[in-house]
Amino acid sequence: MARSRFGRALARVLRRHRLARGLSQEALAEAAGVHRNYVGLVERGELAPTAENAKRIADALKTPLATIISEAEKS
């Protein structure tokens, strides 16, 4: 469960990056090789992504994972 403060911040950052790129959850999921429901769970802060899936999502967003983590830590 990702309901920690960092988990919620990570969820907001991922959603913000997805929307900024004009991607639907489905399009992001397809690009990252994960299920659309997985993206939704992560974005709602209900599930913490594995390190591998976080990297896949960041790559699909064309954003370094370190940038996403840094933004989440600052929020």
Language-model-derived ranges and their functions:
Residues 12-31, 56:
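Short basic helix-loop element that most often maps to the first helix and adjoining turn
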Residues 67-75:
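Short amphipathic recognition helices of helix-turn-helix/homeodomain-type DNA-binding modules
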